[in-house]
């Protein structure tokens, strides 16, 4: 029965419970497991930690046979409890897991039977290790760090934001994790932002339990490091080098690493060169001609290995090649540093907000309330091409 100022205010009528065995509704182990699988629930709201057990439960119910009881809300379906929860924090679990609902491409579901280049090079923890070793990158040219300041809130991914993670049909977010065969959109990446992007948060707005101070590196710091590899085939080495050899006309590609990628931090340019080691020569001579250690290293061209990988790509079927080209196009759009020079770039790639109910203009502004209204994200190419040439 609705009442009060808003539809969120309700009156409830409570009746004495019927504890007789004939009135009980079974709860399956699967439903209980779904409830326990909620990893983001506050521990203080966990029904299983609030329950009465043993003698306390028997006294509460008035039945010596009862050893567990906890008041809760529930939904009955086909004579069984379909889901249960706690007051305003009631959560209805999705009926599918990510793998069972058709959200993953078949190739990923059958990944255990397929070894791709990522598996072959980086390893698969259950079966074999990586053939790469990432060394620490050492600071070579320092520009210092920014003064410590509270950053804009850096939240974790929220599964309930299905409009961001699942492909939607049209402009409305009608497909969620309970929708069968609603595919995941792809890999999550963040747009680059100009060096003056406002990552700081007003100190009057920070929350102790959410926000903290950070000290980002200033632009222009230079680091040097190595990625060591061993026993890679020409094609595998070409696949690895492809990451550092992405190129396109009129583009300057940068990558994203570290914390704060969503608030404009973490953009880096990588200048790579290939150095090969002749191990046999290294064993033959201890010292080099200049008297130093014989490292048996020589700088080599990447072209031979890149061509070996490109030749494999050229053998893809029409559908697979179209999918590969589409992913490469999206990647180039997302990594292009020159995009920050486009007109209205910061406005077109800004963080979505909930809007402020305290501000009448914001409370009804669909643009400001994009996140609350479950605005469906455009594709990377749509965002990039909108400002092309501006």
Give a label for each model feature.
Residues 1-390:
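Basic, Gly/Ser/Thr-rich N-terminal segments that form RNA-phosphate-binding interfaces in CRISPR RAMP
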């Amino acid at each position: 029965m609705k009442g009060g100022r808003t539809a969120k205010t309700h009156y409830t009528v409570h009746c004495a419970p019927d504890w007789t065995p004939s009135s009980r509704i079974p709860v399956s182990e699967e439903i209980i497991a779904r409830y326990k699988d909620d990893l983001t629930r506050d521990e203080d709201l966990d029904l299983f930690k609030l329950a009465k057990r043993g003698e306390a439960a028997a006294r509460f119910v008035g039945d010596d046979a009862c050893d567990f009881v906890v008041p809760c809300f529930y939904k009955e379906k086909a004579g069984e409890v379909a889901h249960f929860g706690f007051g305003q924090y009631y959560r209805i679990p999705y009926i599918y897991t990510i793998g069972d609902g058709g959200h993953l491409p078949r190739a990923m579901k059958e990944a255990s039977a397929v070894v791709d280049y990522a598996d072959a090079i980086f390893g698969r923890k259950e079966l074999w290790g990586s053939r790469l070793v990432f060394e620490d990158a050492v600071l070579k040219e320092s520009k210092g760090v920014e003064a410590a300041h509270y950053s804009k809130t850096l939240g974790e991914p929220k599964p309930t934001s299905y409009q961001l993670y699942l492909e939607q049909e049209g402009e409305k977010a009608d497909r969620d994790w309970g929708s069968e065969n609603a595919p995941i959109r792809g890999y999550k990446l963040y747009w680059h932002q100009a060096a003056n992007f406002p990552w700081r948060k007003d100190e009057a707005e920070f929350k102790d339990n959410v926000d903290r101070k950070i000290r980002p590196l200033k632009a222009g710091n230079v680091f040097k490091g190595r990625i060591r590899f061993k026993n890679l085939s020409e094609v595998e080495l070409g696949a690895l080098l492809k990451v550092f050899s992405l190129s396109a006309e009129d583009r300057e590609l940068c990558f994203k690493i570290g914390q704060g990628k969503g608030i404009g931090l973490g953009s880096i340019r990588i200048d790579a060169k290939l150095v090969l080691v002749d191990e046999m020569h290294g064993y033959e001579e201890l010292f080099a001609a200049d008297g130093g250690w014989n490292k048996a290293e020589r700088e080599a061209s990447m072209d031979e290995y890149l061509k070996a990988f490109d030749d494999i790509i050229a053998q893809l079927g029409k559908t697979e090649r179209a999918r590969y080209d589409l992913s490469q196009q999206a990647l180039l759009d997302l990594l292009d540093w020159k995009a920050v020079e486009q007109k209205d770039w910061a406005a077109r790639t800004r963080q979505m907000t909930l809007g402020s109910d305290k501000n009448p203009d914001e409370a009804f502004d669909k643009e400001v309330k994009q996140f609350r209204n479950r605005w469906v994200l455009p594709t990377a190419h749509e965002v990039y091409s909108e400002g092309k040439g501006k």
